[in-house]
Structures are given as structure tokens and as C-alpha cells.
């Protein structure tokens, strides 16, 4: 009797154990779909990005017109460009839902998987930021200037560091060239770290909605979850194509249709929607260094999640107090996103400060306390 090649061949065996015969909990819901959707987004972004890079020119005198050339003259260039731009938005939608699922169901207790995932978030944010600079429109240029300038808040080495990143005394040709290099390089580092993320996940197996050990009831990934994921994939692609074909500029900034001009500042400098919550936290602190630290901590706080878990139960499924706090956190993030896109004036300033305080209070203080109270209620 001949043995199955997919179970014996060194390469096929890895794929088989990761995507075909992988034992999966039988009760995982559609919230466990986002991992495969993120993998799809990454592949899609890499393919469209490579095709864009074939026609893009990373010189300040050519960058803006090369993007216009892609949109007008390249076969399906408009489609590739719009899919890449809106694909980034979709990528972040999936990331935030994936992280939200992880927090709700206590997936962060798989520390290695969680920490590599948080590192992936940082890398993805860096990639999106340098990518946003490439079209060399007004918002590209000023976002690059403002965000890189934040590093000057670092004591002693700040100014030197900023000039080193700029490659000169202002955002210029050298900056654009290196940002293009980083934007091309980082997705491949993300791919490598994604492999590590999966490696750690498959060491422990997936969590499930109950948070209990599911070893007694596992089913193979294929055909059950490969088909279940296919539904999510079709819905995601339908959403992406609707966005790309009917509302291609809905999530973009109109200022970016104006070529970069160092002599004219846009009335409201703001990043893409997926960074607005962090931008609101940055702006809510009147001190430059304090703002930068708060901005960093708003993401770094995810690394602390496993240490802040006080409950005897893993998921939030059966913990009403923590559930209220979780949904308050989601509402708070939506408020921060709205505030990040508003001008710095009352009442937006004070709302932003209150929302920022609430964000850190929920994650660092209220959730751990709620966990302890729930333990007391159980005992």
C-alpha cells in the first residue's frame, strides 16, 4: 500500500499539517475567519503592490505624475491602484476585528502567538504609513513631515534621529526613496513573521468561544473550515470590489489629489481613518513627548494584556461586567476615531482627552478589577 504523498513529502507535509489535517475545535465561530482573511489581504496587497512598483517612480519630481500615469495609461492601472489603496483599509478592518476577537475570547493567553501578532500590527502600521507617503500628494508630504517630526521629542538624540530618517534637513527626495524601499521590504518581513505567528498558534492549537480545552472534540481544518472560510473570503472580496469600483475615493483624503507643496500647509493634517484613534490620543496630550509616549502606549498596551488578565475564566463570554467594559472600549475607540478627524478646538479637544483617559483606564485598571470582582462573585 503506497503512503499518501501529502503526508510524506517534506514540503507537502508542512502545508498538510497547517491547512488540511490541522485539528481544529469544532465550535469555532465566524470570528475565527479573520486569520485566513488577513492572509488573503496580505497576498492581494503584495501582488497589486508589485504591479504598482513596476510603473511607479520614487523621485519627488515624478512620483505624483507616475501615480497619475498608472491610473490613466496603464492597462487596468486604475483598478490595481484602487484595489491596493482600499485593500489597505480592508486589511486594517480585518486586523482590528481579529484583535477584538482575541481580547473578547482571551486568545492573548497564548502569549507567543499574541506577541508576534502585536509585532505584526506594528509592522503593518509602519508599512501603511510609508506607503501613504509614496503618491507625494499634499497629505502624503505633510503626514510624513508631522509624524517623523514626532521623533524629535526623544531627549538628546531626537533632532539627529529625525534628520537621519529624512536624509537631510527636511522631507525631500532622499526621504521618498527610502520610504519606497521600506514599503517594498516590510511586507516580506510581515510574511516571515506571519509564518512564526502560525507556528506558535499550531503549537497550542486554536482557542474557542468557550475558552475551555477542546482536545476532546477536534475536526480536520479541511473540508470543514476551508469551506467556512471561503464564505468569509467571498464576502470580503465582494465588499472590496464594491468599494473599489463604486466608491474608490470614499476613504481617501481630497488633499492628496494636490501635488505636495512644502510652502502650503493643508488646513487639517490627518492620517488615514485606521490611524485616527491613535492620532486622537497623540493630540489629547498638550506635551510633545507625553503625546508620543501615549501614542506608543496605545498599541504597546496590547503586550500587557496577558499580564493584566485576572479572571479565572478565559473568555468574556460568561463575564457580564467585563463584557460591558469591552463594548465600552469599542465605543470609546469609535469616539477616538471620530475625534482624530476633527480640528483641534473645543469641544473636540476635551472629548478627545476624556476618551483617551477612558481608553487606558478600561484596559489597565477597570478590566483587571472587573476580573477580580467576577472571581469573588463565583467563589
UniProtKB/Swiss-Prot annotation:
Main location: mitochondrion
Key words, A-Z: Electron transport, Heme, Iron, Membrane, Metal-binding, Mitochondrion, Mitochondrion inner membrane, Respiratory chain, Transmembrane, Transmembrane helix, Transport, Ubiquinone
A molecular-function term among this protein's GO annotations: metal ion binding
Cofactors that this protein relies on: heme b
Lineage, broadest ranks: Eukaryota, Metazoa, Chordata, Craniata, Vertebrata
Residue ranges of the TM segments: 34-54, 78-99, 114-134, 179-199, 227-247, 289-309, 321-341, 348-368
Name the record gives this protein: Cytochrome b
Subunit: The cytochrome bc1 complex contains 3 respiratory subunits (MT-CYB, CYC1 and UQCRFS1), 2 core proteins (UQCRC1 and UQCRC2) and probably 6 low-molecular weight proteins.
Species name: Terrapene nelsoni (Spotted box turtle)
Originating gene: MT-CYB
Gene Ontology annotations for the cellular component aspect, listed alphabetically: mitochondrial inner membrane; respiratory chain complex III
Amino acid at each position: 500500500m503506497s503512503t499518501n504523498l501529502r503526508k510524506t513529502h517534506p514540503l507537502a507535509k508542512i502545508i498538510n499539517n497547517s491547512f488540511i489535517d490541522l485539528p481544529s475545535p469544532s465550535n469555532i465561530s465566524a470570528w475565527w475567519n479573520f486569520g485566513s482573511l488577513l492572509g488573503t489581504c496580505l497576498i492581494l496587497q503584495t501582488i497589486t503592490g508589485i504591479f504598482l512598483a513596476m510603473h511607479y517612480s520614487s523621485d519627488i519630481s515624478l512620483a505624483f505624475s507616475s501615480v497619475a500615469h498608472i491610473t490613466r495609461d496603464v492597462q487596468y492601472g486604475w483598478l490595481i491602484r484602487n484595489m491596493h489603496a482600499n485593500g489597505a483599509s480592508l486589511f486594517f478592518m480585518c486586523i482590528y476585528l481579529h484583535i477584538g476577537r482575541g481580547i473578547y475570547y482571551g486568545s492573548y493567553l497564548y502569549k507567543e502567538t499574541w506577541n508576534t501578532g502585536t509585532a505584526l500590527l506594528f509592522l503593518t502600521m509602519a508599512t501603511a504609513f510609508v506607503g501613504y507617503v509614496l503618491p507625494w500628494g499634499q497629505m502624503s508630504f505633510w503626514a510624513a513631515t508631522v509624524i517623523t517630526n514626532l521623533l524629535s521629542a526623544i531627549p538628546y538624540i531626537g533632532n539627529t534621529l529625525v534628520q537621519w530618517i529624512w536624509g537631510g534637513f527636511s522631507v525631500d527626495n532622499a526621504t521618498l526613496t527610502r520610504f519606497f524601499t521600506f514599503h517594498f521590504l516590510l511586507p516580506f518581513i510581515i510574511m516571515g513573521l506571519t509564518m512564526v505567528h502560525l507556528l506558535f498558534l499550531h503549537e497550542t492549537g486554536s482557542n474557542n468561544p468557550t475558552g475551555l480545552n477542546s482536545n476532546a472534540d477536534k475536526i480536520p481544518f479541511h473540508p470543514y473550515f476551508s469551506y467556512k472560510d471561503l464564505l468569509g473570503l467571498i464576502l470580503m472580496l465582494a465588499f472590496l470590489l464594491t468599494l473599489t469600483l463604486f466608491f474608490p475615493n470614499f476613504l481617501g483624503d481630497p488633499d492628496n489629489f494636490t501635488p505636495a507643496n512644502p510652502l502650503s500647509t493643508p488646513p487639517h493634517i490627518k492620517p488615514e481613518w485606521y490611524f485616527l484613534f491613535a492620532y486622537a490620543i497623540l493630540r489629547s496630550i498638550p506635551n510633545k513627548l507625553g503625546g508620543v509616549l501615549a501614542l506608543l502606549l496605545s498599541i504597546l498596551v496590547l503586550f500587557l494584556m496577558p499580564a493584566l488578565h485576572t479572571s479565572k475564566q478565559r473568555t468574556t463570554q460568561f463575564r457580564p461586567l467585563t463584557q460591558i467594559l469591552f463594548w465600552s472600549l469599542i465605543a470609546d475607540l469609535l469616539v477616538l476615531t471620530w475625534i482624530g478627524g476633527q480640528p483641534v478646538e473645543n469641544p473636540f479637544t476635551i472629548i478627545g482627552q476624556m476618551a483617551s483617559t477612558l481608553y487606558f483606564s478600561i484596559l489597565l485598571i477597570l478590566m483587571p478589577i472587573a476580573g477580580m470582582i467576577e472571581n469573588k462573585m463565583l467563589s
